[in-house]
Structure formats: C-alpha cells, structure tokens
C-alpha cells in the first residue's frame, strides 16, 4: 500500500480530523495507534496488537476494549499546556487546575493513570461512592477536590474529613437546604469548610446535552438564592468560607460562541459577588470542552468548531477581561473537562460473525400473462438499457418503487404468489444497482439518490457486540462514534455497509457513520472475505460508555486490555478486565448459577438418556455458565 492510498483512507473515514493524531491508517492498510504524538516512533499496528494478544492470551475473546493510558496522560498535558499558553498570552496572573470528574469514567486504570501522571490535576465527585474513590486517590495529586451533586450528612462529613487530611476540598452548594447541614457538620468536626456555589446561568449551550445547563438545569442556585446564601453565611460569620464560583453550560459544547457567552455571564457573577464582600478565589467553569467525534470541525452535535487553544483563550480572556475592568484579582481557573480527557483513549474491537448481502441474479422476462406491476417493472428495466431512454435516473427509481409497492400490495391480497414477489424484488435490486452505477457523486442533485440507494443496497455486517452495553449513547441519544475496519483498508472500498449487533432488539444497529463527506447512513467497506472477516474498531468510546452500558439480553462488560507503547519499539500490555461470564450476569439479576446448575442436572438425570450423553449435556451447560456472554469461536 502506497502513501497515496493511505492518505485516501485517512480522508475516506475522516480519521485525520477525529483521530487527534492518535490514530491513522498505515501503509499496510491497518489502523495504527500513536499514544503520544510527541513521540511519533512510539506506535503500534492495532490489528497486529489484537492478534498478538489473542495468541498470547488464549482465553481472550472479542469483543474487547483496548485502552491506551498514555493517551490519557497526553490529553492531560495538552489541556494544561493550552491553558498555560493562554495565561501567558493574556498576562493572566491566576493559576489553572484541570479537575477530572470521575463520573465520566470511574475505571481504576483511568483514575490512576491521570493521578500518577505528574501533571497538576484535581478530582471531582458527584456522589458518596465517587467521593470515597476520590479521597483514596487524592494523595497522588494533592491539588483540588470538588464535591458536586446532592449531598446528605455522610457525604458532607466525608468531604470535611478530606479537608482535615490536608486536601483542598470544595463543597459546592447545589441547593439551599445543604448549607445548614454543612455548617452543622463542620462545627461538629471542628473544620472550617471551603464552600462553592453553583450559579444557574441564563446562557445555555446547544445540542444533545443542552438541558444540563441554562435556567432549567437540574443543579444550581438562581440569582435570588445566591444572594440568600451570601446573607446566610454573613449572618454566621462564615462568608470567608465561600471561595469558589461554579457554573456549567452543558456537555460537549459544539459552538465556541456559546462558551464565550457563558464565560462572560458567569464573570458578572464573580464581579457582583466581590461587590458583596465575597472573596471568590476559584472560578470553576465546569465541563463543556467537546471533542470532534465526526471530524467535521462544525457546530453539529457530535463535533466542535474549535480546538484546545481557542477554548483556553476564550475562558482565560473572558475571566481576565472582567477582572481587569473592575480592578479585581485574577482567580484560579478550574475546568472539569472529563470528556476531552478520556474519549480518545479507548477502542472497542470486535469480530464480524456474518454478512447479509444483496445477491444479483440474471434478469429474465415475466410470464406473458403477468400482472401489470410485474410487466411495468420489466419495461423500466428494458428502457434503462435502450439508447433512446428519456427517463431520468430519478424517474426510473420512482417508477420502480411504485411498481414494487403495487407488487407487495397484490401479494398481500393473494393476487401474486411468492415466486412472483421474489422475481419482482430481485429485478428491483438490479434496477437500483444500475441507477447506482450511473449516478455521479459530484452532481449535487444526485446526492440524495446516492444516499438513499446506498442505504437500500448496503451489506448488513453482524458484529459480535452489544450496542446497549458498549455504545449506550449511540442508542440512547443517537450519538455518533467513529467506526471502521482496523485492517484490510488496502483493498478497494467498493461496498457500503451497516453494522448490527447480536442482541435480540431491532434498535441494535449503528445508524450513523463518519465518512469523508461528513455523516452518512452507511459506511464504506472492502468486499467481505468469509475466510478472513475484518475486525471492526469503534473509536473514542472512553467517555461515559463503559459506565453507562446496560445489560440488555444479559450481555456483560467486555474484556479490557491496557496497552503501553514506547519509542524503543517495546509494547507491553495487561488485561485489566476479564469480561463478564454468563454466571456473572445471572447473579446480577439474582439467578444463582449453582441453583440453575442443580435444576438443570435434575432435568438431565430424569430424562431417558444414557450416562455418557448426560455427562456431555451437563458439561456443556456448566461450560456455558462460566464462559463469555458474547459469541465465542470454537
């Protein structure tokens, strides 16, 4: 495979833009991973890596997550560097801390890889369980802990204990009823609390996650409540405890203008609080830093029209400008950029278990006494091959669709038999294929027809995974994730395909794909080789997907492999997750595997079977109980 073909593959799947320099197509036509773009020699062929791990770890079965902790650390360095440049550029005198909200991915490998990176990093918790995880890892970072979410007294006490241990723990007030509990528990523990307030802004981002920001958001205090909080603290001489201002515009903000507008409004809260005598020291802009899942660099829901540097510049300039205008000190800026930290670092790899393709047969004329829809279809087919054809491609397609609809209607009323219906459907497929061959992708008028026919004619690839477990946001909120074969891209991409999972649910299908023209309903694929089926990679699944995945059809967590790539060519890995067994999933729903085994054994013993067959059936059942929930190769 030469460089020209490699470049073409980069464009075909838009990988050059969504890959973030971490993923690219190599000269062999396989996807390569470069976990640290600052060390371009430290790279690994993903397909070869999967095969190596399968060979060395005989028990490993696909699907499996391949995780690259070095990407996490590079993302952390990149975000910190962007804010350092912005502060230097605008003469910003305050500090900056990136805080990781662990709800994005609470896996141990993620928290420990980030906390042990040597980079400044804070941690954020939104529940008691998360706070316990954060406190246990806080000794590795020694910076900032932000406590969000609704809180009971136990949550509050844990946070105050963290303060007592020497951490900077900010209890962010989300509702007015929390403040009395915080003050009471702080007095009992003899701790001066560090408080934050989450202000509910009028500004709101757009997109799939817009409800998490704005005036109707679930969390935060309205302007009147912020004033009440200030007076409550002033009355008990605890105004100095209120040190952090927090706001949240929304997750995955696509438009930089929304970010700039939100920062400008929140900066007014900072100014007004100082006028009230509140010495706010930290300005937490929350989440919102998005990633470009589709690589279009646009304002669409799964893209962003800005980069790290522009984001940092807008945040730092917006806050600094308001401070300078009113002669106020520059606060420490905090961002909670969990998605931007984690999305790139994980790839789900799985195997294709089967393909359903349209088969094109030799066309034959209908019977002389065939019904009108059948003869009309044949006339359309013949006219398409005649030199004097005056029908447009669109007209031929519409005529064929109308005739096929009439065929289905007549079949439903018993006027046509199954053979006639099958003949009509095969001829219609041939008409569609002929129209496809004559369409010109550069003709804008042809694009809707091309898209329609690609979807109609696409191969169905059945992939060994659960959309609901591994890509829950693709099902739940129609989020797009980059998907492509991780091998065989040196072959012509002369097919279009859709991917279906193995659940018994019609929603288990990937509806949207990234290609060179943006987003499409099908994906380009090489011709399917049953002797060497391709492995499929689902990219940028490191944020939220692992923790949101559900157990539909009792498909469980997949295996996970942590991979480290070094510039001397060395590659090491360890399997951090075994993947759920059938027994694991049954126990989740309170079905005891031992009880099931005993009941099945009773049935087998009571059946009229010879001893050898009984033992075989029992062994098969027991083996299945402790096997992988996904389809396993023999």
From Swiss-Prot:
Modified residues (N6-(pyridoxal phosphate)lysine): 103
Keywords: Decarboxylase, Lyase, Magnesium, Metal-binding, Polyamine biosynthesis, Putrescine biosynthesis, Pyridoxal phosphate, Spermidine biosynthesis
Family: Belongs to the Orn/Lys/Arg decarboxylase class-II family. SpeA subfamily.
Xref: PROSITE patterns: ODR_DC_2_1, ODR_DC_2_2
Classification via InterPro entries: Ala_racemase/Decarboxylase_C (IPR009006), Arg_decarb_HB (IPR040634), Arg_decarbox_C (IPR041128), Arg_decrbxlase (IPR002985), De-COase2_CS (IPR022657), De-COase2_N (IPR022644), De-COase2_pyr-phos_BS (IPR022653), Orn/DAP/Arg_de-COase (IPR000183)
Reported cofactor(s): Mg(2+); pyridoxal 5'-phosphate
Gene Ontology MF terms: arginine decarboxylase activity; metal ion binding
Record pathway: Amine and polyamine biosynthesis; agmatine biosynthesis; agmatine from L-arginine: step 1/1
Catalysed reaction, written as an equation: L-arginine + H(+) = agmatine + CO2
Name the record gives this protein: Biosynthetic arginine decarboxylase
Function: Catalyzes the biosynthesis of agmatine from arginine.
Keyword hit for Lyase: yes
Cross-referenced HAMAP family: SpeA
Documented EC number(s): 4.1.1.19
NCBIfam families assigned to the protein according to its UniProt record, in alphabetical order: PRK05354.1, speA
Organism: Photorhabdus laumondii subsp. laumondii (strain DSM 15139 / CIP 105565 / TT01) (Photorhabdus luminescens subsp. laumondii)
Gene3D superfamilies noted in UniProt: 1.10.287.3440, 1.20.58.930, Alanine racemase, Lyase, Ornithine Decarboxylase, Chain A, domain 1
GO annotation, biological process: arginine catabolic process; putrescine biosynthetic process from arginine; spermidine biosynthetic process
Pfam families the record matches: Arg_decarb_HB, Arg_decarbox_C, Orn_Arg_deC_N
Keyword Metal-binding in record: yes
Binding-site residues, substrate: 283-293
């Amino acid at each position: 495979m030469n460089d020209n073909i490699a470049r073409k593959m980069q464009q075909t799947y838009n990988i050059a833009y969504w890959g973030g320099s971490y993923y690219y197509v190599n000269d062999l036509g396989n996807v390569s991973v470069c976990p640290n773009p600052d060390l371009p020699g430290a790279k690994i062929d993903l397909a070869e890596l999967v095969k190596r791990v399968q060979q060395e770890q005989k028990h490993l079965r696909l699907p499996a997550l391949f995780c690259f902790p070095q990407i996490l650390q590079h993302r952390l360095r990149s975000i910190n560097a962007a804010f350092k440049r912005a502060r230097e550029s605008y003469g910003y005198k305050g500090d900056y801390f990136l805080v990781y909200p662990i709800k994005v991915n609470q896996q141990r490998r993620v928290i420990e890889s980030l906390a042990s990176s040597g980079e400044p990093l804070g941690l954020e918790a939104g529940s008691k369980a998360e706070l316990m995880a954060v406190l246990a890892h806080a000794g590795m970072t020694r910076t900032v802990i932000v406590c969000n979410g609704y809180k009971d007294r136990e949550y509050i006490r844990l946070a105050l204990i963290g303060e007592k241990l020497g951490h900077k723990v900010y209890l962010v007030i989300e509702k007015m009823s929390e403040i009395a509990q915080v003050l009471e528990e702080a007095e009992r523990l003899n701790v001066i609390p560090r408080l934050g307030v989450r202000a509910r802004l009028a500004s709101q981002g757009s997109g799939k996650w817009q409800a998490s920001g704005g005036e109707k958001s679930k969390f935060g205090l309205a302007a009147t409540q912020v004033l009440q909080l200030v007076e409550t603290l002033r009355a008990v001489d605890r105004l100095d405890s209120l040190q952090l201002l927090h706001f949240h515009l929304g997750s995955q903000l696509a438009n930089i203008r929304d970010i700039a507008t939100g920062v400008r409004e929140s900066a007014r809260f900072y100014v007004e609080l100082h006028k009230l005598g509140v010495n706010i020291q930290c300005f937490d802009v929350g989440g919102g830093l998005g990633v470009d899942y589709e690589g279009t660099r646009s304002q669409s829901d799964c893209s962003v029209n800005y980069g790290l540097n522009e984001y940092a510049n807008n945040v730092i300039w917006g806050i600094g400008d308001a401070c300078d205008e009113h002669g106020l000190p520059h606060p420490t800026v905090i961002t909670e950029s969990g998605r931007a930290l984690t999305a790139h670092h994980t790839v789900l790899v799985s195997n294709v278990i089967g393909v359903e393709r349209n088969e094109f047969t030799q066309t034959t004329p209908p019977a002389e006494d065939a019904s009108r829809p059948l003869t009309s279809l044949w006339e359309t087919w013949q006219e398409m091959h005649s030199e004097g054809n005056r029908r447009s491609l669109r007209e031929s397609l519409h005529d064929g669709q109308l005739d096929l609809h009439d065929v289905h209607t007549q079949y439903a009323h018993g006027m046509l038999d199954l053979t006639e219906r099958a003949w009509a459907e095969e001829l219609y497929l041939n008409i569609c294929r002929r129209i496809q061959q004559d369409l010109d992708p550069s003709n804008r008028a042809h694009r809707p027809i091309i898209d329609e026919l690609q979807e109609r004619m696409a191969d169905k690839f059945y992939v060994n995974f659960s959309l609901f477990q591994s890509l829950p946001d693709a099902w739940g909120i129609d989020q797009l994730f980059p998907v492509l074969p991780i091998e065989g891209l040196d072959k012509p991409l002369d097919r279009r395909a859709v991917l279906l999972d193995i659940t018994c649910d019609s929603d288990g299908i990937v509806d949207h794909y990234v290609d060179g023209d943006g987003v499409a309903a099908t994906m380009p694929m090489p011709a399917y080789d049953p002797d060497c089926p391709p492995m499929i990679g689902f990219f940028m699944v490191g944020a939220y997907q692992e923790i949101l995945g559900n157990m539909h059809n009792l498909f469980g967590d997949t295996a996970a492999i942590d991979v480290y790539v070094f510039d001397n060519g060395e590659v090491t890995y360890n399997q951090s997750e075994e993947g759920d067994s059938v027994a694991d999933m049954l126990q989740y729903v309170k079905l005891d595997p031992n009880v099931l085994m005993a009941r099945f054994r009773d049935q087998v013993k009571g059946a009229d079977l010879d001893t050898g067959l009984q033992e075989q059936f029992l062994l098969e059942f027991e083996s299945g109980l402790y096997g992988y929930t996904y389809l396993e190769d023999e």
